[in-house]
Structure formats: structure tokens, C-alpha cells
């Protein structure tokens, strides 16, 4: 029976169909220009860029230029790459230009699609960012598609890990910049820790196209980018508490796998209190007394570490370190650490060295970073299941782009077995049958542990020729994925490992040529070998096609339908045949957590025998329902987190904008004077209550605070004794004395140095207080949830108290800046004052596809100081040119040749 909605769609078409249909007139207009474009010489075609820029200068909008610009970019791609964008790719390009998400199936050429809106938007000269999930793809695409942009006269840059600030500035200044989401986010944070505008590398957030947009804006939305600095060592505390958790019995705690929460029962709490008391760690009578907040935090983390986190599923131990496993991709994420002390609890559990906790210096979520862009768009193979989230959070509409050729892949119903053992028997049998007839098989698993269990089983069953693609073997990832389409190939992969590399039937000719002929010089012999490889790949492709194309065999359902769809989507690219099937058991995580008991009873009643499967569309529907529930819950979590993060994000934007204004400002004397007046108002109001008699004034307190904040010794006692003296008189006299002292200091320093000193003091003080404020907000957020028990809305409470904390921070800023500037002295005026140094920083910087930290050594490494602080060898320093000195140690001989230590010569600035 057709639903009313289905009937309406048949008559009127869906909103998606209408959006696609609305682009057709422009597609036809672009096609109508094709012969005209082909008739142009290379010089004439490239010259159109300058003409378009002139049109924009004369008032034309980018929409006005869409048809001719797309026609130009299409012809350039045909000439330079030998690739002509199809009509459906033009539609995808228009969706991206309009600030939407284009859902395009695997193999439909998303990389090429992006060139069309990138070219059009780059004409405005404000920069376009193409965002990918790892350095490999950013570099590959910038070189590959960069040929089109360069042919058309545009500059292209790429941001990858390890570049200097100068190289980053050049890349960001390009018309088109390819970069990873992590590099963009960290450059934004680092820019907002700089002390001079010229040191910043980014030039604004105009337009971004995010590749694999679901991975970046949904899967990674909850994981903030964090720059942090080290805190005190608490390893002994973690180890002690870990020994207590081991002593607990199942009745001492309750675990909820579905919600991923754990709590202590009354018996457990009592047992813990006794253990903590014996270890002299408990203050007061109860574990939940206010002075034991930190201890509660530690014991909760230790319980989670032991009961909610499994080794080889959620993390592995490698080289004496806990390495997190990405739940979506099954990849290792070296360098990424759980926050709030959970990682340290896992280290204590596994008896490896406990790394110190870090204090957050700056952080931003991808949700908030990408909302900085004036226009944002994205592409992926799977976005429709998250359409509501993209719409609600980012204001992005998802449009499903039709495929160039119809998808003929056969998606078969799930096979459900009672036990994991029965399921694996069926999987091995299925793999054997597919391999025997020469059908390439991609076997999808949800974790490293399961991929290796299956690999062991295949070995025992006599399989020799198969590949395992999981976090342990990421180095060969692209190569394994590229050859997974060979006839009879068996590839076991965790979830979406290798995303970004197509599985081509017969194998990937380009990668084979690079691999087999890497060192062979150009010439007739190499050309002959290349032709042989291409012919061999074609032959193998025909064989794989005859066997039915790629068979995607999934061993488990993921919590998210989108991840399942991504796995299915590896098969049936560009009209190729293929098939997909999920093999499940009632002992799988999703089935177990979401009510498999009822189904088990039902299957027993139906008389299901051992090794028999149940296959029915109803089962698929029931599973989809369970997945929708999980997705809805995860969306609610992300939405709720965003509401809280928006509070700190609004404050972050205010602070970062203020920093830029301070760096841009020629003179800050007026701002400093206002701060000073604010401090004077506060200390006078505190000492002299409204309508109070002179005898009631706190004269001693006022004198002490004038000395503390203004560095002035004023006869406040004598003033207070004067007949008829009022509060305003006291305030005016203090202000006059403070202004006179500030003016005298400014004249001694000179305007240039004074401006530098003021800017440095304000920026450094603001940064220090902002870091403390971030910690305070984190603490507030961790406790505000309990207000719900008092029938108060935790979010409103958080907003109110966060605002109060922010106001208090600004008050502290006024006081600290005033106190410092009223004391600062010039020991020796440097010829060129060195910029302040940033604090020691650690960056958690994870590649979204490989799940690895891009810092060298695979560890969370000390962030490299900016290039103006780089160490320069003494022999390379010119005594007469300070720009060549780099970073000089304070106790080194001054490079100017005076013979004094640097700190007593050019570095003598306090």
C-alpha cells in the first residue's frame, strides 16, 4: 500500500527532485557553450579568468558568471586532465556553489566536481579552502586538480603538517588552498595565540568545500581540537585508585552499555570509602562531600576504564602506550588522548607509564570552526541519513545527485544467526564460494579485534592469499584498497578504512605502474611495460565483471546506518555490477544492546536449527529501527553539547576578535586609560560605600589597593580628614595622580616602545586569564548537570554562571593590566624589541582518515615555536641585522658583538 507521502511524491516529485530539476536550464546553457570553448586556444581559454575578474570588479555577481565559468573550467579539465565533467557533475558543482551538500555515490568523481565551484568562487580573490581528511589526499588533490587551476591562471597552495609559518602564509594567500580539517583548525587556534598581526597565517574564512563532510562535521563533531600545556604529575593517585577498583565485585556498581555510563551502588560506595580512608585519601565522612570532588572524578574514571573500555576494541597497548581506536573507522589514533583523566585511568589499568594531564590553552570544535565560514558546502557518498543534523546545526541542505550510470548493485537481505560461531561459519563458506568463482570480496568488520579473529579463522581454514586492512597495517592502506578489486581478491577491512581511494575492478593501473615501474626511466621500454600493465588490468576487470563485480560482505551492523551505507557503496561504482550482504548474530553488540532476547525467543519458537539463518525484510526493518534510535540519541547528544559549546564559543569569538583589534591598534593608551579608570572606580566604590560618612570609609583598605593596583603612595588618610571631601573628589585625585604617572612613563619610554609594551602586557594577560577561564568553564560544565535535580534548567544555569565568570575575567584583566603597566620599567631600550614567546604547547592533531597524529614520532609532541623564534646557528647571524638572529638564549653572548650576555644587552627588556 502506497502512503499519502509516497503518492504525493509520485505526483509532484520530491523536494530533492525539484532541486535537481531547477539546475537543468543552467546545465543546458553550459552544454550550449561547449563548442565555443573548444574553439578557443589555450591562451584564450586561460585569458577568460582575467575577463571574469574584470566583470566582478564592474559589479557582476558570481551567480551571473556561473554558466560561462563552469563552461571554462570544464573545458580546462578536458584539456589538462583528459576528464570532462558529466552533466550530473555540473549539478553537483552548482549545489556546492549554492552552499549545500552534494551526496554523490562512490566513484562519481567528487574530486573533479569540486573544481567547478572552486574556480568560480576563487575569481572573487578572497580565497577558497578545499578541506580533506588527511595530508595524503590534500597533497594528491592539490597536485592533480591544481593543474586545472594553474592552467586558468589561479594560484594553488596546500597546507600539510610540518610547514613553517611563512609557507603557511603563502599557501593561505593562494586563490585555492587544499588543507586538512585539523590543520585549518589548529592554524586558527595558533593564530589567536600570536602577539603580532604579521605573525598570523590565515586571512579569513570566505568559502570552504568539505570533502567527506559527514566524517568531519558529524563523526568528529564532538571531538574538539585542543592545544594544551602540561599540569602537575598525579600518577600515584591513579595507580592507587586502580588497585581499589580491582577489589570491587559486580554488585558494587551498575553499568549501562547503551548510555555508556557507570555508577557505584551503595555497597560499592561504602567499600570505596573504607579503602580511601585507609589510604588517607578521603576527606570528611562521605565520598560525596564537596572536598572530595577530585577523588570522585578519579574513581569514576577508573570504573569506566575497567568496565566500559575493552582492550583491542576501544584501545590497544602499543610501545607502552594506550592508543585509542576510532569507533567509526577502526583505525588507531596515536596522539589522541581521552580528556578529563580517563586516559590516565586506562594507563593505570594496563600498568603502562602514566602521562601527565594537560591544561587546555585553546580549543575549538569542528562544529564551531566551520561555522566561521561565510559560505560552507560539502560532498560525500552518504549524507541523507544525517540531513536533519546538517540542516539544524550548519544550515546546509543535502541534495542527492543522480548517478551518471544507474546503480545495478544488488543489496541482499541480512542473514541472522543465533550465535557468533554460526555466523562466522557462514561467512567463511560465503568467502570460499565467492573466491572460487573469481569474485573480489571486501569483508567489513567493526573493530581490529574482529578483523584479526576473522583473519585467524581464514588461516585455519586454509586460506593463504588475503589482505587485512586495519589500524595495525595502515601504512599499506591505499595500496591494499586499490588492488582489492582483482578477481578472487579477499580483503578484510575495519569499517571505512581506505576511504578516499576507489576500489576499481581489476585493480588500479596507475598505482600498479607507480609500484612496479617506480625506478624505471622514461623511454620506449617503460611505455611498453605501462601498456602491458593497462592491458592486464583491463583483462582482470573483465574477469571480475564476469564473476559479478565486487562483493561487500559485512560481518556486523554498525550503530549508524550511514557507516553501513558507506561500506555498501564501495561496490557498484560507475554502473559496475556488485552485491552486498550483512551477516549478523544475536550476540552482536547492536543486537545484544537493543533487545535480542525477544528475537532469540522468537527464533527458538520458529524452530530455527543450528547453522540455519533467518532472512526476511522484517528483520532489516527492525534493525533499521534500532539504528535510527541510536542515531537520534547521538544527534541529541551532539545537539546538546553544541548548546553548551555555543556559550564558550561566543566568548571565544569576543576574546579572539578583541585580540585582533589589540594587534591592529596603533595606540592602546586610550583603552589602557579606560581600564585604569574602571579599576579606580572599583576600588573607590569598595572602600567608600554609597551615602557613607567619612568616618565609615575604609581608608586603610583604599590606600593599600591604590598601592597594589596603581603603584602609588598617596596621602589618602589626609584627604579623608579634609572638611567636606566627597567620594568624587577622592576618585578625581587618584585618577589625576595615576594619569600623571602613566604619562611620565610613556614620555620616558617613547611612543613606539610604549605601544609595544602596552600591547604585549594586555595580550599576555588576556591569554593567561582566558586559559584559566576555559578551565573554570570546564569545571562548571561538569557539575551544572546536577542542577536538574533541583528542577532548574542546567543549560540556563550554565549560561548565567558562564556570563558571570566572563565578567569576572574582564574585571581581573583590568586590574592585572593596570597593576603591571603602572610598574613596568625599561631596563635598556632594545633596538628592536623581541615579540613575546608563546607558552610551551602540546597539540592533539589527528588525521581524520588514518586516525593518526601528524606530529613526528606519532606522539603528542611539543608544538614547534613560530619561525621568528627558530634557533639560528651563531655563524649564520649577522651582528648588524637583528632579523638574522632567530631565537637567542638569554644567557648566550649577544650576537651584536658587545661581549655582554643577551639578557643584559639586546634582550634586556622587562
UniProtKB/Swiss-Prot annotation:
How is the cofactor bound, in the record's words?
May bind 1 zinc ion per subunit.
What membrane topology is annotated for this entry?
Peripheral membrane protein
Q: What is its EC number?
A: 7.4.2.8
Quote any Pfam family the record assigns.
Answer: SecA_SW
Q: Name one GO cellular component term.
A: plasma membrane
Q: Which residues does the record give as ATP binding sites?
A: 89, 107-111, 502
Alphabetically sorted, this entry's keywords are: ATP-binding, Cell inner membrane, Cell membrane, Cytoplasm, Membrane, Metal-binding, Nucleotide-binding, Protein transport, Translocase, Translocation, Transport, Zinc
- Classification via Gene3D superfamilies: Helical scaffold and wing domains of SecA, P-loop containing nucleotide triphosphate hydrolases, SecA, preprotein cross-linking domain
The membrane spanning regions, by residue number, are none
One Gene Ontology MF term: metal ion binding
- Binding site residues for Zn(2+): 894, 896, 905-906
Q: Which domain of life is it from?
A: Bacteria
Cellular localization per UniProt: Cell inner membrane; Cytoplasm
Would I find Transmembrane among this entry's keywords? no
User: Per its database record, what is this protein's job?
Assistant: Part of the Sec protein translocase complex. Interacts with the SecYEG preprotein conducting channel. Has a central role in coupling the hydrolysis of ATP to the transfer of proteins into and across the cell membrane, serving both as a receptor for the preprotein-SecB complex and as an ATP-driven molecular motor driving the stepwise translocation of polypeptide chains across the membrane.
Per the similarity annotation, which family is this? Answer: Belongs to the SecA family.
PANTHER family associated with the record: CHLOROPLAST PROTEIN-TRANSPORTING ATPASE (PTHR30612:SF0), SECA INNER MEMBRANE COMPONENT OF SEC PROTEIN SECRETION SYSTEM (PTHR30612)
- Quaternary context: Monomer and homodimer. Part of the essential Sec protein translocation apparatus which comprises SecA, SecYEG and auxiliary proteins SecDF-YajC and YidC.
- Its protein name is Protein translocase subunit SecA
Q: Which organism is it from?
A: Mesorhizobium japonicum (strain LMG 29417 / CECT 9101 / MAFF 303099) (Mesorhizobium loti (strain MAFF 303099))
Q: Which gene encodes it?
A: secA
Amino acid at each position: 500500500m502506497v502512503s499519502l507521502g509516497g503518492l504525493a511524491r509520485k505526483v509532484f516529485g520530491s523536494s530533492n527532485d525539484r532541486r535537481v530539476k531547477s539546475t537543468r536550464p543552467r546545465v543546458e546553457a553550459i552544454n550550449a557553450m561547449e563548442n565555443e570553448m573548444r574553439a578557443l586556444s589555450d591562451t584564450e581559454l586561460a585569458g577568460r579568468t582575467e575577463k571574469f575578474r574584470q566583470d566582478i570588479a564592474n559589479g557582476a555577481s558570481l551567480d551571473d558568471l556561473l554558466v560561462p565559468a563552469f563552461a571554462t573550467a570544464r573545458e580546462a579539465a578536458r584539456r589538462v586532465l583528459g576528464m570532462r565533467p558529466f552533466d550530473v557533475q555540473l549539478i553537483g558543482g552548482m549545489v556546492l556553489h549554492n552552499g549545500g551538500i552534494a551526496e554523490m555515490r562512490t566513484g562519481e568523481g567528487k574530486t573533479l566536481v569540486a573544481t567547478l565551484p572552486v574556480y568560480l568562487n576563487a575569481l572573487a580573490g578572497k580565497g577558497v579552502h578545499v578541506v580533506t581528511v588527511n595530508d595524503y589526499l590534500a597533497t594528491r588533490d592539490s597536485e592533480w586538480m591544481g593543474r586545472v587551476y594553474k592552467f586558468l591562471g589561479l594560484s594553488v597552495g596546500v597546507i600539510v603538517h610540518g610547514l613553517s609559518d611563512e609557507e603557511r602564509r603563502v599557501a593561505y594567500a593562494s586563490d585555492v588552498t587544499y588543507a586538512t580539517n585539523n590543520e585549518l583548525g589548529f592554524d586558527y587556534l595558533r593564530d589567536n595565540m600570536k602577539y603580532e598581526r604579521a605573525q598570523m597565517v590565515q586571512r579569513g574564512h570566505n568559502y570552504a568545500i568539505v570533502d567527506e563532510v559527514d566524517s568531519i562535521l558529524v563523526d568528529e563533531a564532538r571531538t574538539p581540537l585542543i592545544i594544551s600545556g602540561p599540569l602537575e604529575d598525579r600518577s600515584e593517585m591513579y595507580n592507587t585508585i586502580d588497585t581499589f577498583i580491582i577489589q570491587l565485585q559486580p554488585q558494587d556498581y551498575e553499568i549501562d552499555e547503551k548510555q555508556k555510563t557507570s555508577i557505584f551502588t551503595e555497597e560499592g560506595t561504602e567499600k570505596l570509602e573504607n579503602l580511601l580512608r585507609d589510604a588517607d585519601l578521603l576527606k570528611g565522612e562521605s565520598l560525596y562531600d564537596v572536598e572530595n570532588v577530585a577523588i570522585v572524578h578519579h574513581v569514576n574514571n577508573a570504573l569506566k576504564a575497567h568496565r566500559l573500555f575493552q582492550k583491542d576494541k576501544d584501545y590497544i597497548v602499543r610501545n607502552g602506550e594506550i592508543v585509542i581506536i576510532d569507533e567509526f573507522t577502526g583505525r588507531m589514533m596515536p596522539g589522541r588522548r581521552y580528556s578529563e583523566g580517563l586516559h590516565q585511568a586506562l594507563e593505570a589499568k594496563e600498568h603502562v607509564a602514566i602521562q601527565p594531564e594537560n591544561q587546555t590553552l585553546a580549543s575549538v570544535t569542528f562544529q564551531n570552526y566551520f561555522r566561521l565560514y561565510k559560505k560552507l558546502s560539502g560532498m560525500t557518498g552518504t549524507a541523507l541519513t544525517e540531513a536533519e543534523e546538517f540542516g539544524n546545526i550548519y544550515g546546509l541542505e543535502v541534495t542527492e545527485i543522480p548517478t551518471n550510470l544507474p546503480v545495478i548493485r544488488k543489496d541482499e537481505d541480512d542473514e541472522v544467526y543465533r550465535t557468533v560461531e554460526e555466523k562466522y561459519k557462514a561467512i567463511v563458506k560465503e568467502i570460499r564460494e565467492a573466491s572460487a568463482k573469481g569474485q573480489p570480496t571486501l569483508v567489513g568488520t567493526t573493530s581490529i579485534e574482529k578483523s584479526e579473529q576473522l583473519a585467524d579463522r581464514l588461516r585455519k581454514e586454509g586460506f593463504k592469499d588475503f589482505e587485512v586492512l586495519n589500524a595495525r597495517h595502515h601504512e599499506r592502506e591505499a595500496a591494499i584498497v586499490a588492488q582489492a578489486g582483482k578477481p578472487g581478491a579477499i580483503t578484510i577491512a575495519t569499517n571505512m578504512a581506505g576511504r578516499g581511494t576507489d576500489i576499481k575492478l581489476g585493480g588500479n593501473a596507475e598505482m600498479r605502474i607507480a609500484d612496479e615501474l617506480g625506478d624505471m626511466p622514461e623511454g620506449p621500454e617503460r611505455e611498453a611495460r605501462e601498456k602491458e600493465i593497462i592491458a592486464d588490468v583491463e583483462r582482470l576487470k573483465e574477469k571480475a565483471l564476469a564473476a559479478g563485480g565486487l562483493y561487500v560482505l559485512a560481518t556486523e551492523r554498525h550503530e549508524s546506518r550511514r557507516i553501513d551505507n558507506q561500506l555498501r557503496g564501495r561496490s557498484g561504482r560507475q554502473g559496475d555490477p556488485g552485491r552486498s550482504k550483512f551477516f549478523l548474530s544475536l550476540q552482536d553488540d547492536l543486537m545484544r544492546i537493543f533487545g535480542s532476547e525477544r528475537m532469540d525467543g522468537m527464533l527458538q519458537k520458529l524452530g530455527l536449527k543450528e547453522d540455519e539463518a533467518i532472512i526476511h525484510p522484517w528483520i532489516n526493518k527492525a534493525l533499521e529501527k534500532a539504528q535510527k534510535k541510536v542515531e537520534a540519541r547521538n544527534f541529541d547528544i551532539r545537539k546538546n553539547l553544541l548548546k553548551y559549546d555555543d556559550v564558550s564559543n561566543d566568548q571565544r569569538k569576543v576574546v579572539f576578535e578583541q585580540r585582533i583589534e589589540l594587534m591592529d591598534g596603533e595606540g592602546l593608551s586610550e583603552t589602557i586609560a579606560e581600564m585604569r579608570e574602571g579599576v579606580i572606580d572599583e576600588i573607590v566604590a569598595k572602600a567608600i560605600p554609597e551615602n557613607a560618612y567619612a568616618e565609615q570609609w575604609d581608608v586603610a583598605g583604599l590606600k593599600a589597593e591604590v598601592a597594589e593596583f596603581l603603584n602609588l603612595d598617596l596621602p589618602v588618610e589626609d584627604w579623608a580628614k579634609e572638611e567636606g571631601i566627597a567620594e568624587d573628589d577622592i576618585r578625581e585625585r587618584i585618577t589625576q595622580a595615576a594619569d600623571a604617572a602613566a604619562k611620565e612613563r610613556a614620555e620616558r619610554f617613547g611612543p613606539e616602545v610604549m605601544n609595544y609594551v602596552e600591547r604585549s602586557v594586555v595580550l599576555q594577560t588576556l591569554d593567561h586569564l582566558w586559559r584559566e577561564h576555559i578551565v573554570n568553564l570546564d569545571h562548571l560544565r561538569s557539575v551544572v548537570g546536577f542542577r536538574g535535580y533541583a528542577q532548574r534548567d542546567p543549560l540556563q544555569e550554565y549560561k548565567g554562571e558562564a556570563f558571570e565568570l566572563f565578567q569576572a575575567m574582564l574585571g581581573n584583566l583590568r586590574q592585572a593590566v593596570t597593576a603591571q603597566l603602572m610598574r613596568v620599567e625599561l631596563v635598556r631600550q632594545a633596538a628592536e624589541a623581541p615579540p613575546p614567546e608563546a607558552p610551551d604547547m602540546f597539540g592533539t592533531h589527528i588525521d581524520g582518515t588514518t586516525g593518526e597524529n601528524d606530529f613526528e614520532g606519532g606522539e603528542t609532541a611539543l608544538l614547534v615555536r613560530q619561525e621568528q623564534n627558530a634557533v639560528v646557528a651563531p655563524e649564520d647571524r649577522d651582528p648588524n641585522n637583528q632579523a638574522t638572529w632567530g631565537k637567542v638564549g638569554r644567557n648566550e653572548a649577544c650576537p651584536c658583538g658587545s661581549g655582554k650576555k643577551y639578557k643584559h644587552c639586546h634582550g634586556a627588556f622587562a
